[in-house]
Amino acid sequence: MSEQVCKADMGSDGAAVVDTYGYPVETTGNAVLDILEHRSSTRAFARDDDDRPVAVTDEQRAAILHAASRAPSAGAMMMYSIVSIREQATLDRLADLCDHQPMIAKAPWALIFVVDYAKWIDLFEHVGCFEPEFVERTGKSPRRAPGLGDFAIAAQDAMIAAQNAVVAAEALGLGSCYIG
């Protein structure tokens, strides 16, 4: 390449920082902003000599899931769940269910973020919010079940958690790809 790379665009090892296509990119000196700037979807994951996906370590998985759990959520309700998939047969089936996208089957690990009202309902039932005695005891109306607006909020919360997971994966040197 004939483009000049300034010192600010060098990695810690002195090598030029390049984008997905090999072109030099500018860096800000801020690790989070640089991760966000340089992140792109990965559809070809690292393979070992036997053409198996390179495993994501337990420590990497824990860090990514912890980052996802730190995402803000409406009312701190976290009305979503994260399904972790490492079994090849399940990855194969997921690839088929998601419009036959083979990169899912070739990934070492997949996370599914789903709206999950069960947590809300279980909590309300546990503390008696649906019982007539609740009104008597607290002077408040009985709590309602989740509605359509709550579904939208829960879906947004799930996507915020997913974005935290993506940024954490990128920070750990792992690629990711959202599947709709």
Give the ranges of each region predicted by the language model.
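Acidic, surface-exposed loops and disordered segments
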Residues: 1-180
